[in-house]
């Protein structure tokens, strides 16, 4: 099922949950895990995926994507191969469109798959 992605992100490594995510959370929302992206971070909460994208030379301009788990219709995960295929990939089909998430070597695709499964199936 090949469709053009409306967004593509790369998760570089797991990281501590950023302190400055708190103002973005609603009552009852708890952060579960965070990942460093090329330009900022992505945080999985119990309600949604929040991806921050710092822009410009100073990084003061920040675009924030918020993807509620209820909008995810389907997802797939692909683990890395052996020889030349080092990256894993997570794909999300949502009401807004198709989103690709590339995962650098060392990011646990099965942990992410479990996190998405738990969030989507319990939303």
Q: Predicted regions span which residues?
A:
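Phosphoinositide-binding peripheral membrane targeting modules
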Residues: 24-41, 45-98, 114, 118
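Short, highly charge-biased, low-complexity peptide segments
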Residues: 97-105
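Anionic N-terminal interaction surfaces
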Residues: 1-42, 104-106, 110, 118, ...
